């Protein structure tokens, strides 16, 4: 899903929550948008290039061209159940973590809707443990 969609939806939820949480509502925006940095981290690891704009262009061009299958099996650490569990635990210890987790959940929801209706599939590797075990088994 394109970053602007995550931005718009996260901004809308942040605006709704602003009267309650004030400026901290910006953490919803951070949680809803910044977790896609793991796409960049994977690109940098896989292609040995640290160019953010090249990574962005790569994902925009290749995902749709390959019918949204070129990202199957990649590890997106911020899109894992373990990261979500960590954020849920941390959300009990501060408003900022709580609001970030709201943005994160919104991001996951938008990704799930996109994957189901547009890419016609569900998330492939939703767990860090699953990804490590699967890749370790495949290498043996």
PLM segments and residue spans:
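N-terminal membrane-targeting hydrophobic helices
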Residues: 1-140
């Amino acid at each position: 899903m394109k970053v602007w969609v995550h931005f718009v939806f996260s901004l809308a939820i942040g605006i709704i929550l602003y009267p309650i949480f004030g400026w901290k509502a910006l953490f919803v925006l951070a949680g809803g948008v910044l977790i896609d940095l793991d796409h960049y981290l994977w690109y940098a690891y896989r292609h040995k290039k640290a160019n953010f704009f090249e990574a962005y262009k790569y994902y925009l061009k290749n995902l749709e061209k390959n019918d949204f299958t070129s990202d199957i099996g990649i590890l997106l650490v911020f899109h894992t159940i373990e990261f979500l569990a960590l954020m849920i635990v941390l959300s009990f210890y501060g408003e900022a973590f709580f609001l970030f987790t709201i943005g994160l959940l919104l991001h996951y929801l938008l990704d799930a809707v996109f994957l189901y209706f547009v890419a016609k599939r569900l998330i492939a590797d939703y767990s860090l443990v699953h990804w490590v075990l699967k890749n370790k088994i495949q290498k043996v």
